[in-house]
Amino acid sequence: MAWYDNAVFYHIYPLGLCGCAHENDGQPTPGAFEKLNAWAQHAADIGCTAIYIGPLFESGSHGYDTIDYRLVDRRLGTNTEFKDFVAQCHARGQKVIVDGVFNHVGRDFFAFQDLKANRENARYKDWFCDVNFWGNNEYNDGFSYGNWGGFNLLVKLNQRNPEVQNYHYDTIRFWVDEFDIDGIRLDAADVLDFDFMRGLRRLANEIKPEFWLMGEVIHGDYSRWANPEMLHSVTNYELHKGLWSGHNDHNYFEIAHTMRRLQGLCHDTRLYLFSDNHDVERLPNKLRNREHIRHIAILVYTLWGIPSIYYGSEFGIEGKKEWGSDWPLRPCLELSDYKDAVNTNPVTSVYAALGKLKAQLPELTWGEVKELQLTTQCYAFARVLDGEACVVVLNNGDSPAQLEFQLPVEASAAKDLLADTVGAQPIMTGIEWGRMKVQLPSNYATILKLEK
């Protein structure tokens, strides 16, 4: 068992959370790492055992236009402060992973500055893709070049160049030696060179035990990236889409089909599960019925994978993209505004309870997933391990529903594990002749522990 197999991640976008300037003016945000450490402690309090923080390193604007891979963004603080942050997380038992933006760099990156200054004679011209000295761009460089997503702000690196590969490998060694990080989330992994990622995996196996590589992949066969030769995991965007649209459309078949399909492709690989992140709108802005936030939180924690929370989502905050800007998805928040949320906010309460259950019940991590009942509006499945079972029951309909299914293990009673959460509703269960009946209120979900 590796640490990431039973991890619960808390995702922090630090430039947003700390209220940093959107364009890098070189000025530190007072108390940034003190604030980040307080949020990491909060994450531990609700059961998160790992912190994914990023982008973190010196950039010109949003963090993904890297200027210096080995210098913490001056808007946040210093290398020493980040080193202390990691040490404090480790003291709490939390692992720390950072963003690795290896596909592209910002225009102020040293090698691109050399290309601008020296053109055909540039020492580093082969570090970049599709350089054309007969072309031009909106910056009037007098040449054109490959980029990410059509944005010339993000200059594409040539990952097949051994010098570029070794530069990135040395950067990772620096991050481990200097900061003692535990893994990397690879930005834009779906356009990274596969041989480069194989090299990353070999390096990961050498530099630190259980060093974790997780890639940002949107579409496709995830097993092409997540496999024993390349990455340990990838972002499960396919399930992310199903989580909100399956509830909006009252269609649990979409979620169940997605999980079956991914199990067929990826087998026991644990994909990174999320309901929202720094690139997509928050659940309250996507769901037609916000009561379904509870359902989605339960699914993220109980389906096969690695659950995560994006900062602020445990409070049910909103976040909607504006034209040309993702900053509304990455807000500055103050913990003091939510100091009693676990006792008053239904969303916070259920996330905190799920964190405790994940730590207490091994079947939620290691148990086989057994589908028990599936309709468009009702879904029941179990996590079964060594004769123990938790049963997840969900109703996305506007009317109460009765579920009935075969017991996955022998049992005589069932305990509602989320009965004490804020906003919990009473449910009725009955067991007879190896079958179980559950009466669920409308738009409600919970987890039942089967008892002998």
Where does each model-flagged region fall?
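A structural motif
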Residues: 48, 180-181, 305-306
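Substrate-binding/active-site clefts of carbohydrate-active enzymes
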Residues: 1-9, 13-49, 56-178, 200-206, ...
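Active-site groove signature of glycoside hydrolases
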Residues: 104, 168-194, 273, 277
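Solvent-exposed beta-strand/loop surfaces of large extracellular or lumenal domains
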Residues: 415-435
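Loop/helix patches that line or flank the sugar-binding groove of alpha-linked glycan CAZymes
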Residues: 2-6, 24, 28, 255-412, ...
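Active-site-proximal helices and loops of the catalytic beta/alpha 8
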Residues: 90-92, 116, 177, 187-267, ...
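Hydrophobic faces of well-ordered beta-strands that scaffold small-molecule active sites
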Residues: 8-11, 51-53, 96-98, 184, ...
